Swiss-Prot record:
Signal peptide: 1-14
Tissue-level expression: Expressed in pollen (at protein level). Expressed in pollen.
Protein name according to UniProt: Putative invertase inhibitor
Keyword Signal included in the entry's annotation: yes
Keywords: Allergen, Disulfide bond, Signal
Source organism of this protein record: Platanus orientalis (Oriental plane-tree)
Length: 170
């Protein structure tokens, strides 16, 4: 009986860190939806035992996964016959997401070494890369981004990490 009660308390406290963090993040960042944050962080089993620093690493890893999905999705589009202008913007996005991945990997190392100011700079760079990808499609009339929804999810994931760096004192 005592063990099951202790486990219930542990899971309630764990859920509270995700929900509490997401509440603070959503209040501070216009790029983050509370429900998206809770769903994203809560989907990782490690979030249930993580501290704030750990949630920063988890959200950064989720951003890497989302960036990889976007690159794969773009690769499939590029294998089909596409307008040359669209192809140019998609290729630009592939390069931008490669840069973003490097930035996020460095930010993860910074989180782990508690260099939150550096993690903040690198997560900002990754967020900027995804915005630049999306903005590229607006340069030519009649070209619509096929990755808008995916980019929005990526922006939220990087914004979560970015906001966590600020909560940690960056």
């Amino acid at each position: 009986m005592k063990l099951s009660f202790s486990l219930c308390i542990f899971f309630l406290i764990s859920a509270d860190i995700v929900q509490g963090t997401c509440k603070k993040v959503a209040q501070r960042s216009p790029n983050v939806n509370y429900d998206f944050c809770v769903k994203s962080l809560g989907a990782d089993p490690k979030s249930h035992s993580a501290d704030l620093q750990g949630l920063g690493v988890i959200s950064a890893n989720l951003a890497i996964q989302q960036g990889s999905k976007i690159q794969t999705f773009i690769g499939r589009i590029l294998k089909s016959k596409v307008d040359p202008a669209l192809k140019k913007y998609l290729n630009d996005c592939v390069g931008l997401y490669a840069d973003a991945k490097s930035s996020v990997q460095e930010a993860i190392a910074d989180f782990k070494s508690k260099d939150y100011a550096s993690a903040n700079v690198k997560m900002s760079a990754a967020l900027d890369d995804s915005v630049t990808c999306e903005d590229g499609f607006k340069e030519k009339k009649g070209i619509a981004s096929p990755v808008t929804k995916e980019n929005k999810d990526y922006v939220q994931l990087t914004a979560i990490s970015l906001a966590i760096t600020k909560l940690l004192g960056a």
